[in-house]
């Protein structure tokens, strides 16, 4: 599509075709990370057969593996495997999901990091210079799909924040990255062997860009459009050597139209939105396509709204309290949602 835009004389707002191809191939992204000296989980260099995946699993001495689609994303085409007997089914399902969702069947394998936190670095480049706009914590997930995102991470040490940010910048510089991009990492600060590793890069604007906007005061969509129009970072008043500081904390809560079965499996919720009243006020932002009378389609993403709260306080618990109040003010009827799940998450003492 990007090449077709160029051939038609149109400017695609986003990375160029080469960067989309590179980061759309997770195995190629691993190769880039290796070239830049960025830590990786032990894994295959490219697509593997089931027999090769089984041999890799056996070599991990019980650590388990992640089976991932080379062209996957959004939590699809991924399976964690802890028992050898489960590997054939996981492999087959990843291949099937990858074929259906992305048109690519290849899968690769990595050692499983059991106690990982998910940290991502927001990058902006103009083709010559690149800079970091801070990190986001996306550890609260269900079946590898994000539910709650936070900026900046309240759990990351300054040492690891610096190391991970520099790794993301090194990879972006190596390819002369242009546009917005997100470099994603797994972190286990308790590990002496691999406290953090690169997992993938997403060459696009992320759903959770909102929390970065709230703590930096930057409009990421506007910046992406400006870079696509040929503007440099310096012409936009941005200095890669002096990235914008974060103020306080922001939390994004994904309100989905879904039901949660007894088996823990989420399924799309259907019906007509009879009531759709979401909170407003200082420190509360809502991005949504929902409205009373709407009938969300069960055939696409179940996301109804992004509820984003922010606090300028340096104490994360203050933002967490605002999140609890905002969720309590939501009134949605007619379609089942995950509001109760989100309320349960932010009410746990571990969340503060």
What are these regions (language model features)?
Residues 52-53, 86:
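Short acidic active-site motifs
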């Amino acid at each position: 599509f990007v090449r077709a835009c160029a051939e038609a004389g149109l400017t695609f707002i986003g990375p160029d075709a080469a960067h989309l191809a590179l980061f759309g191939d997770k195995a190629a992204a691993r190769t880039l990370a290796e070239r830049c000296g960025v830590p990786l989980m032990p894994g295959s260099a490219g697509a593997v057969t089931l027999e090769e995946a089984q041999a890799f699993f056996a070599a991990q001495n019980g650590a388990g593996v992640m089976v991932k689609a080379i062209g996957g994303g959004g939590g699809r085409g991924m399976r964690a495997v802890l028992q050898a007997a489960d590997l054939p089914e996981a492999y087959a399902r990843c291949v099937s999901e990858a074929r259906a969702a992305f048109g690519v069947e290849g899968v690769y394998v990595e050692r499983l990091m059991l106690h990982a936190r998910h940290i991502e670095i927001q990058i902006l480049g103009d083709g010559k210079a690149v800079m970091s706009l801070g990190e986001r914590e996306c550890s609260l997930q269900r079946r590898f799909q994000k539910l709650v995102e936070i900026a900046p991470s309240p759990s990351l040490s300054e040492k690891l924040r610096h190391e991970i940010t520099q790794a993301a910048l090194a990879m972006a510089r190596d390819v002369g990255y242009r546009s917005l991009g997100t470099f994603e990492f797994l972190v286990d600060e308790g590990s002496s062997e691999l406290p953090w590793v690169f997992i993938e890069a997403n060459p696009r604007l992320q759903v959770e860009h909102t929390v970065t906007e709230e703590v930096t005061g930057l409009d990421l969509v506007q910046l992406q459009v400006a870079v696509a129009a040929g503007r440099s970072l310096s012409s936009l008043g941005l200095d890669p050597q002096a990235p914008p500081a974060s103020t306080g904390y922001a939390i994004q809560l994904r309100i989905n139209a879904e039901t949660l079965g007894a088996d823990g499996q989420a399924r799309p919720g259907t019906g007509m939105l009879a009531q759709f009243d979401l909170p407003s006020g200082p420190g509360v932002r809502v991005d949504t396509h929902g409205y009373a009378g709407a009938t969300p389609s069960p055939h696409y993403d179940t996301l109804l709204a992004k509820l984003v709260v922010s606090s300028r306080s340096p104490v994360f618990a203050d933002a967490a309290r605002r999140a609890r109040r905002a969720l309590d003010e939501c009134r949605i009827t007619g379609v089942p949602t995950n509001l109760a799940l989100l309320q349960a998450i932010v009410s746990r003492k571990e969340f503060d």
